[in-house]
Amino acid sequence: MNTQLNNLILPIYMDYQATTPLDPRVMEAMLPYFTTKFGNPHSHSHSFGWEAENAVEEARGDIAKLIGAEAKEIIFTSGATESNNLAIKGIAKFYGNKKNHIITVVSEHKCVLDACRHLEQEGVKVTYLPIKPNGIIDLEVLKNAITDQTMLVSVMAVNNEIGVIQPLKEIGKICREKGVFFHSDSAQGFGKVPIDVNECNIDLASISGHKIYGPKGIGALYVRKKPRVRITPLINGGGQERGMRSGTLPTPLIVGLGTAANIAYNEMEKDTKHVNHLFDKFLDAINSQISEVYLNGDKDQRYKGNLNLSFAGVEGESIILAIKDLAVSSGSACTSASLEPSYVLRSMGVDEELAHTSIRFGIGRFTTEQEIDYAVKLICSKINKLRDLSPLWEMMQEGIDLKKIKWATH
């Protein structure tokens, strides 16, 4: 239920890592393909089909352009979860009779970790690399983990929970030198940070529409043609998408993804400037008014549309309830329904108490200065109020180490 306050529409959306609103320009581009331009892009005997096919191919080119790829290297899927599964399982199934080792990272998105666990049940060996306290992998540890049995390294571009950017160029160089395929889940990075698949030697990259102001239900997988990468399809049928992903293509959604990619290509610099300014404003204001607030993840090597903050002494769930006028989350939208502390924060070495106090704030293209001002004011008043009520905060101020307390059970 939306309410209005001094030209502000409440609640304020600050969960841009979970999803983004559809850019009105994207909606406008999509609409004709639901109504008058409804043809099947695989129908080659009449103008309805040709028109739809042209729109699909134009979108394919716009998506490729954003990552320095060729249009033919873009395979359409239903979203980044499918793309990640297709990349990881597709490589394992195609090359599995020659090699049987995959390397990924403990802080990857759930769908990458679950795809790898699924392959482990089928006999594939998986190494889960640790991350440093700043959320970034150690390149030496990666180098040492690669064996002659390694077929794939999968490392995400931008982390969905803490926003850190992994050193893709250096990872790609190591993989290319060792003759290992490099997959990157780029759902949170595509269209937000510069990614060049050739510069970074990326062989496979997963893309999502709804993370870049495009529609839900559409994504893509970049699959390198030179040197050629082969994958076994997960879905069999009419052989669409170079035989890698069968099924009639959803033209309106593809047009939406292509338009969103084109806008990102033209406006990335402007978006980055806007987001960086609001990030600095938000963080400086919070730090100046609240003590013991910790930014999770490297401050510089990050996409600044993601602020994951821990507020010592206050439970994350109680913060969310207290700041109902802000739409935020306590971690990945796919796992924030559980009361377990974030596995990403735990793998960075953040202790359990502090991990429980973390909130992820998302800033995006449509966030305004006025919204940031309101958010800061609300957060500061509520956090200070919650701390006044918290016996744990009081004990911390008295220098008592909460870890050493033996709590009585009743």
UniProtKB/Swiss-Prot annotation:
A molecular-function term among this protein's GO annotations: pyridoxal phosphate binding
Catalytic residues in the record: C334 (cysteine persulfide intermediate)
Protein name: Cysteine desulfurase IscS
Subunit annotation: Homodimer. Forms a heterotetramer with IscU, interacts with other sulfur acceptors.
SUPFAM superfamilies found in the cross-reference section: PLP-dependent transferases
Organism (species): Rickettsia bellii (strain RML369-C)
Subcellular location: Cytoplasm
Listed InterPro entries: Aminotrans_V_dom (IPR000192), Aminotrans_V_PyrdxlP_BS (IPR020578), Cys_deSase_IscS (IPR010240), Cysteine_dSase (IPR016454), PyrdxlP-dep_Trfase (IPR015424), PyrdxlP-dep_Trfase_major (IPR015421), PyrdxlP-dep_Trfase_small (IPR015422)
Cofactor: pyridoxal 5'-phosphate
